[in-house]
């Protein structure tokens, strides 16, 4: 399924650039994109500057983050709300991305050493 089908048209309408983070974890790469001054030594800064422009406009640069791990969902929603207040578009999608349609198992290790499994 195309990710545009997962995001509403209004969420990406007006985006000149769209960064797709497939396997976003906690969304740090999106922070590198939108908040480069907080990460001056990030190796991604040069890549983002090259492809999105060093003087990119965060109002027309958008990010779509795919992350299937439910443990990270609340973090992505908080990040989305923070960016929304600034007028920046960050679309977290609670889904995995892959080339094959076969099921996968997501393993989450807790601080107590327990392992939970989520079939996706």
Give residue spans per PLM region.
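Phosphate/nucleotide-binding beta-alpha loop and adjacent structural elements of enzyme active sites
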Residues: 1-120
């Amino acid at each position: 399924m195309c990710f545009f089908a997962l995001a509403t048209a209004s969420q990406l309408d007006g985006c000149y650039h769209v960064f797709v983070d497939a396997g976003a974890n906690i969304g740090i790469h999106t922070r590198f994109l939108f908040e480069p001054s907080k990460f001056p030594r990030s190796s991604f800064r040069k890549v983002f500057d090259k492809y999105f422009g060093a003087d990119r406009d965060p109002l027309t640069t958008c990010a779509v983050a795919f992350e299937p791990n439910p443990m990270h969902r609340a973090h992505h929603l908080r990040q989305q709300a923070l960016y929304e207040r600034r007028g920046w578009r960050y679309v977290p999608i609670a889904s995995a991305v892959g080339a094959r349609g076969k099921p996968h198992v997501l393993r989450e290790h807790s601080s107590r050493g327990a392992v939970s499994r989520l079939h996706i």
